[in-house]
């Protein structure tokens, strides 16, 4: 489960510039969480994931994350190898604001870093140097840092699929050892039917050119869809609905921030409350959906399809 609690090796109020050793290897699933504040007069700051701390010659930088506030605000990402910079990857969707606090979550994935700021996905950066070689984090520039924390994890290390708390229905999807993803469409029976306090977790990765995908909670006997979650990346809409008595109801689309982006890893948590479903993406609450299908105990099936790699499903 993606949680920003229980971080390890937390460093509080470090003096900037800060250069510190990362005590364990960064493997897929590891998180680095940096909380701080941008001063009024800041023009730029950077977080560098380095191979050592040498100054002469300068240590290689596997991932250089550099928000800039001068002229057009942007985030510049790059890699430094043998004192030479590679090509810049620039993101103009700027989540940082002067005189505002921030929380940056760097997640290490198998092929890339995934970065979220204040709970919102910001960018992906493909590995040019293996993250397992990174042993140092450096923070430089005009920035105040309140804390740096780590969660060393190998949850995603094997990327082997699982379906805990569910019994898969469509035989072609039955798990094979070492399989890298669950095939779609995926349908599975919950080992215990839905009700207040029940939770379903779906872990996956959005395809590069994804248009949409859907996650449905279904009453198996009637095939009514109690909860239809349908992120549409092509229009940035997170559509919710129910399919009851052979008819779709009224769509709900209102959302503060669309939480998905092509190529990103996600953990979707669906929690069943007495009056509604609550949905969180990557540990951040996203929406509520009032129950339209009242017989919660009849909801016994999970269905997933669309433009994603489905890695893991769990229910308890």
UniProtKB/Swiss-Prot annotation:
GO cellular component terms given for this protein: cytoplasm; cytoplasmic vesicle; cytosol
Pfam families noted in UniProt: Gal-bind_lectin (PF00337)
Coiled coil: none
Binding site for a beta-D-galactoside: 248-254
Domain Galectin: 18-151, 186-316
Source taxon at top rank: Eukaryota
GO MF term list: carbohydrate binding; integrin binding
Keywords annotated in UniProt: Autophagy, Cytoplasm, Cytoplasmic vesicle, Lectin, Repeat
GO annotation, biological process: cellular response to virus; lymphatic endothelial cell migration; plasma cell differentiation; T cell costimulation; xenophagy
Signal peptide interval: none
Subcellular location: Cytoplasmic vesicle; Cytoplasm, Cytosol
SMART domains, per database record: Gal-bind_lectin, GLECT
Binding site for a carbohydrate: 68, 78, 88
Gene3D superfamilies: 2.60.120.200
Subunit structure: Homodimer. Interacts with CALCOCO2/NDP52. Interacts with PDPN; the interaction is glycosylation-dependent; may participate in connection of the lymphatic endothelium to the surrounding extracellular matrix.
Function recorded in the entry: Beta-galactoside-binding lectin that acts as a sensor of membrane damage caused by infection and restricts the proliferation of infecting pathogens by targeting them for autophagy. Detects membrane rupture by binding beta-galactoside ligands located on the lumenal side of the endosome membrane; these ligands becoming exposed to the cytoplasm following rupture. Restricts infection by initiating autophagy via interaction with CALCOCO2/NDP52. Required to restrict infection of bacterial invasion such as S.typhimurium. Also required to restrict infection of Picornaviridae viruses.
Domain notes: Contains two homologous but distinct carbohydrate-binding domains.
PANTHER family registered for this protein in UniProt: GALECTIN (PTHR11346), GALECTIN-8 (PTHR11346:SF22)
Name of the featured protein: Galectin-8
Gene source species: Mus musculus
Gene: Lgals8
